[in-house]
């Protein structure tokens, strides 16, 4: 697989999330919350920006070479002559700053996680790829020796002997086996917590386990969670994380760390041209809103933040069906409105485990004999899907493996048979592995696809060698198959699963 690269030289104009254009008239744009390219809002001054090409994303007028902007509104787009004609006798100034550039509307990351993005990227990042952040770049660690060396350097750099060392980005296939013993060799006294690259696993050394007050006995008898941990190795994954996260977050997700991480994430998204994002599966309490609003809701933050309620946590918390629906409606009702808000009548459900951990459910298993996991059992997923389907919700269903996709499509088929809904737009989220028959079923059932194309760039080559084999790894994220069947398709980063860099994601699916 070739390395991805930029195909065009692009400048993102402003932070307008959509274009509403005509060829010889005026049109309004959605509210612009970044004034970088807008001249003196509310003064009546019109600026006409010229460009080599403007990709409008409007089917009736896909290309332009000039766009007229006044304050928060896009007035017209087309050729320079067409724009002048549309403006009539209104005064305007022509700005040729982008004359040799290609312009895009503001970019939307359809699926990312601000809480995870803030936490992961505020740790010592030692990952499988470079992470270019505002003011700092974390280079990739390419093998086990390099990984452990970087971890030891991070330990040595900490001043306080009792300070925690938090790191994110570890992956078995790049960095070799990691366990409690290996972390104890880095430090037997400093608490160390390593967050696996997928964010679905944690490794703790003995000092961290003692600092958090965990005991082996307390880890037993907790249902599925107790089957997804290894005490001796200091390893917790998927549902097993429920056993450790509350105490761990008290020392990890401190207000100081979260404020730093969120502000860094705002700068990171802005430098990559993101103008809006959604987090499907948000766990937001009143305290989280208090943290988010001053930062994400600030007038100075140049993008919108939208959220969809998480249904998996309702199962984990033991809520019944009626209680779950009421809890969802309450969470949306209590949320603020404006730049930071919940989207009503939408819900996030989960099928199988993370692809980055190779814990998705595969019909033909894995080449090394390990097995995948369910984030929600098929039975729970079916019940919750039926609950929210019957209540008129749009379903967003996380699924990565082809076996997981079979389960999701079977559930969707039952919903359509029992309670048909037109234009339900159920979202197949991530869409890592599939076959052509499954893509055809997606089309027949009226679902849509939100895919993560970074899987093919970041992981396919390694998975061809380990776990999946080349036949399945080389066919991950079948975007072309989706488009051939006229299924609506969007891309997302799932930050921090992939970098939130939409221009790179434009390139990723076309390279094999």
Indicate residue ranges for each PLM-predicted region:
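Alpha-helix termini
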Residues: 157-159, 334-335, 415-420
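Acidic (Asp/Glu)-rich catalytic clusters
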Residues: 296-298, 332-338, 421, 442-444
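N-terminal Sec-pathway targeting helices
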Residues: 1-11
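Ligand-binding beta-strand-loop-alpha-helix segment within the catalytic cores
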Residues: 448
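Conserved alpha/beta core surface patches that mediate binding of polyanionic ligands
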Residues: 330, 338, 342-345
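Divalent metal-binding segments
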Residues: 29-51, 55, 59-326, 345, ...
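Bacterial N-terminal signal peptides
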Residues: 10-23
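His/Asp/Glu-enriched, well-ordered alpha-helical/loop segment
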Residues: 260, 386-396, 400-426, 430-431, ...
